[in-house]
Amino acid sequence: MSHQYYNPTTTRLQRSELAVPGSSPKMFEKALNSNADYIFLDLEDAVSPNDKISARENIIKALNEINWREKGKTISVRINSLDTHYMYRDVVDIMEQVGNKVDTILVPKVGTSSDVYMVDCLLTQIENQKKLKNKVGIECLIETALGMSNIKEIAQSSNRLE
């Protein structure tokens, strides 16, 4: 029998989760004062196409102005799917401007390990260029049959996975 060893991932308190649309800044303070341990600021499903860019700007502003960690919150940003033209700017703008204030990037519609690899490479390049001390984790949403059929490879694709 063969065994494969994995580096342990970061463990974060996640008893309750709250999704907050990036297009609704008034909801940021409510999320901050909620009992949720884990908050994901959403750039994907909860945001209409016309609001994608302003939602990204709202999230960057909120991460700069609000001390989420002081309230014990784990902060994730759900980026747009890799097959959209928003995804690249989501990762680059968030990481370059507030990468030190983000715990994880939530990647939707992951279908293969190469999807994770792409995000991992972007994060690594930005973290190195910006000299960020903490590595941002990656969380994957498996939402398709393709993702389910590749689940083992996806689960082994990065030591950033949480």
Regions found by a protein language model. Give the residues of each.
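N-terminal mitochondrial targeting presequence
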Residues: M1-S2
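Conserved alpha/beta-domain cores
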Residues: P8-E162
